[in-house]
């Protein structure tokens, strides 16, 4: 366990991403939920046939290789944001750098939960990863998102990957609430 000395409403999420950038390890991906590092996990449809590997190193924040067959409902990367309070924020945003051997799209979402109930709020843009490193910047205008609760018991930043084969390297991921 490491100490989080970051401040601000988004400190919990920024700390989890900082720890992922420093993490070096690998593991297998199967259906269900799989911890990558503290506060970061992969979630795949438990009813689907999903297999793959992930690897994190100093050169690549997270490299994913997944294969899913059948009617896969979701394949996703979750970053826990704690109880991120958005009362004083105007926007919530992300900056992601990625690369993929073939173009692939990823939908980004802020999930806000209270108990077992949650609300998904999707960012307006779709992230596209190419065969050369690219940067994706997206912001969610909180005033134009009335279904997004300003306060929640827990929140996750979720990257929803397309169903089927996923081959993607996340070079860096940053988030901010301002």
Annotate the PLM regions.
Residues 1-48:
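Extracellular carbohydrate-recognition regions
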Residues 61, 76, 89-93, 135-137:
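Intrinsic-disorder/low-complexity, polar/charged segments enriched in Ser/Thr/Lys/Arg/Asp/Glu/Gln
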Residues 101-113:
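Beta-strand acidic-aromatic groove motif in beta-rich domains, primarily in extracellular
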Residues 138-177:
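Extracellular beta-strand ligand-recognition surfaces/modules
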Residues 80-104:
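Extra-cytoplasmic beta-strand recognition segments
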Residues 117-152:
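Extracellular carbohydrate recognition and processing domains
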Residues 49-72, 126-132:
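Short carbohydrate-recognition loop motifs
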Residues 65-87, 115-119:
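Secreted extracellular polysaccharide-interacting domains
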């Amino acid at each position: 366990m490491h100490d989080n000395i970051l401040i601000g409403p988004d400190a919990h999420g920024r700390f989890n991403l900082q720890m992922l950038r420093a993490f070096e390890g690998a593991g297998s991906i199967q259906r269900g939920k799989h911890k990558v590092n503290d506060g970061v996990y992969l979630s795949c449809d438990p009813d689907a046939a999903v297999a793959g590997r992930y690897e994190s190193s100093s050169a690549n924040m997270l490299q994913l290789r997944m294969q899913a067959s059948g009617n896969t409902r979701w394949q996703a990367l979750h970053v826990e944001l704690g109880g991120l309070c958005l009362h004083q924020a105007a926007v919530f945003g992300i900056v992601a750098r990625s690369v993929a051997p073939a173009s692939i799209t990823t939908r980004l979402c802020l999930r806000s939960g209270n108990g077992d109930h949650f609300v998904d709020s999707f960012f307006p843009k779709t992230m596209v990863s190419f065969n050369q490193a690219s940067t994706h910047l997206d912001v969610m205008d909180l005033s134009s998102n009335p279904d997004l609760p300003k306060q929640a018991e827990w929140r996750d930043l979720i990257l929803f990957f397309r169903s089927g084969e996923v081959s993607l390297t996340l070079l860096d991921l940053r988030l901010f609430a301002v």
